[in-house]
């Protein structure tokens, strides 16, 4: 079956129309990733830092059990999705080849309702992320590598 030029043009235009929502969805997942896990300003979070950040990032209704904040720059985090700072890990995930300074906030206490209390663990860790179209969209874990 041979397509005429008008039909090819229609298929091309429809294809263009379907691409932006997919990219926009990936961008929104990347923005959510940054909102949940990225904090370039702090270098060494403590318990008060965790309580403040979890509240500011709206992760306290219910109290999120665990969350990791990455204290690096966006370019280095995005580079994990490529070959500059990442390598394949455990299926379709990527692990950073360099360590990032992170603060891990763990919920302490029995109730999942506010006020939420957190214990902080700060240190350098390699991070494991999922990527879509070259952007990090999910932080799976952080690994201490001596």
From Swiss-Prot:
BP terms from Gene Ontology: actin filament polymerization; angiogenesis; antibacterial humoral response; antimicrobial humoral immune response mediated by antimicrobial peptide; defense response to Gram-positive bacterium; hematopoietic stem cell proliferation; innate immune response; negative regulation of apoptotic process
Motif Nucleolar localization signal boundaries: 55-59
Catalytic site positions: 37, 138
InterPro entries according to UniProt: RNaseA, RNaseA-like_dom_sf, RNaseA_AS, RNaseA_domain
GO molecular-function term, one example from the UniProt record: DNA binding
Annotated GO CC locations: angiogenin-PRI complex; basement membrane; cytoplasm; cytoplasmic stress granule; endocytic vesicle; extracellular space; nucleolus; nucleus
Main location: secreted
Residues where tRNA binds: 105, 127
Record-linked Pfam families: RnaseA
Stored SMART domains: RNAse_Pc
Disulfide links within the chain: 50-105, 63-116, 81-131
EC number: 3.1.27.-
Localization annotation: Secreted; Nucleus; Nucleus, Nucleolus; Cytoplasm, Stress granule
Activity regulation comment: Has weak tRNA ribonuclease activity by itself due to partial autoinhibition by its C-terminus, which folds into a short alpha-helix that partially occludes the substrate-binding site. In absence of stress, the ribonuclease activity is inhibited by RNH1 in the cytoplasm. In response to stress, dissociates from RNH1 in the cytoplasm and associates with cytoplasmic ribosomes with vacant A-sites: ribosomes directly activate the tRNA ribonuclease activity of ANG by refolding the C-terminal alpha-helix. In response to stress, the angiogenic activity of ANG is inhibited by RNH1 in the nucleus.
First-tier enzyme category under EC: hydrolase
Positions of post-translational Pyrrolidone carboxylic acid modification: 25
Family: Belongs to the pancreatic ribonuclease family.
Function: Secreted ribonuclease that can either promote or restrict cell proliferation of target cells, depending on the context. Endocytosed in target cells via its receptor PLXNB2 and translocates to the cytoplasm or nucleus. Under stress conditions, localizes to the cytoplasm and promotes the assembly of stress granules (SGs): specifically cleaves a subset of tRNAs within anticodon loops to produce tRNA-derived stress-induced fragments (tiRNAs), resulting in translation repression and inhibition of cell proliferation. tiRNas also prevent formation of apoptosome, thereby promoting cell survival.
Name of the molecule in the record: Angiogenin
Organism whose genome encodes this protein: Saimiri sciureus (Common squirrel monkey)
Gene name tied to this protein: ANG
């Amino acid at each position: 079956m041979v397509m005429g030029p008008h039909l090819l043009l229609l298929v091309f235009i429809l294809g263009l129309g379907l691409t932006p929502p997919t990219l926009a969805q990936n961008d929104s997942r990347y923005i959510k990733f940054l909102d949940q896990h990225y904090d370039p300003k702090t270098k060494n979070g403590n318990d008060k830092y965790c309580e403040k950040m979890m509240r500011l990032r709206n992760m306290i209704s219910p109290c999120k059990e665990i969350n990791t904040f990455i204290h690096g720059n966006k370019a280095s985090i995005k580079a994990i999705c490529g070959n500059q700072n990442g390598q394949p890990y455990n299926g379709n995930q990527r692990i950073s080849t360099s360590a990032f300074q992170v603060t891990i906030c763990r919920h302490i206490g029995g109730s999942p309702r506010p006020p939420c209390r957190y214990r902080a663990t700060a240190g350098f860790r390699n991070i494991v992320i999922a990527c879509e179209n070259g952007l990090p969209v999910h932080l799976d874990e952080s690994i201490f590598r001596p």
